Structures are given as structure tokens and as C-alpha cells.
């Protein structure tokens, strides 16, 4: 074997190793993207669970809070807005506009729920209703699960974005059309606190 053949073989080995490294980077970006999309799917499950609880809360309260029709309707409207934003975000997890719209809708829903629960405290019979107590306990549990799922999503997005922004991952991300994903950031300080459910 001549020196030229050995050199050519060495270059070939280096090229193959480099290509394998690039494939590994690409596959890592795909895995990280799938992780943050799965993390959003976990949020999605909890949000749907909460959206399903809200009409039951309102229906339970209707008989006691007949004079608070405006508040009850505001809660349902905020829920419907949040559901629409969640549907768009679940189709585009990590999309900046979708996540911003979801955040805004969730702020509106949290505000409506807090007003509703604040008014519900003025109705002693409602406060004592076992169904209402069970629904509120379930809502509190779901709010906690949403918070944990949101944190897991944001962590997964940070890992993905870091891989897309650091060298040499940024080169592979550019060729592979991997876009930076948006965190689910809460736009208002009040939204950082879970819905206050206390009876």
C-alpha cells in the first residue's frame, strides 16, 4: 500500500466520522424537538382536564349565584378563548405567536376564575356544597399539574434551543430547518400564581 492510498483512506475515515457526527447532531435535534412537543402534549392533557372542570363548577354554582350571571358567562367565555388558543398552540408547540396567544388567554381565564371563586365565597350554601368542594379540589390539583407540566415544557424548550443555538448544532439546525421554539412564559405576575381556591 502506498502513502497516497493510506492518506486517501485516512481522509475517507475522517469524512465518514464527520458525517456520522453530523447525523448524530441532526438526530439529537430531532429527539430534543420531539421531547418539547411531548412536553406540550402533557400540558395539553392537563389544560383539557381543567377546561372540562370549569363548566361543572359554573353549573354547580348557577343555582346559588343566579344574580352573578355576568361573572358565570365571563368564566365560560374565557374558557372558550383559552380552549381555542390551546388548540392552536397544540398544533404549533413552541411557535412564538401561538404560545403568546395561549399565555394571554390563560391570563384571562385565571382572572375570570379568581373573580368567580371570590364571589362564590360570599355564598355560604355554595361553600358547603360537597360537589363544589370536590370540583374545587380537583381544580387545585389540576392547576398544580399544569404548573409542573409547563415547567417541564420550558425545560425541554431550553434544551432544544440551546442545541439549536450552539456550534456546531446551529449549522445543522440551519440546514435541517430547525426553528427556535418559544417558551410558555406568563405575561402577568398574577398569572404566575395558581388560581386561588379556598373555601
What are the functions of these language-model segments?
Residues 2-199:
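A helix-centric hydrophobic-segment signal that preferentially recognizes long
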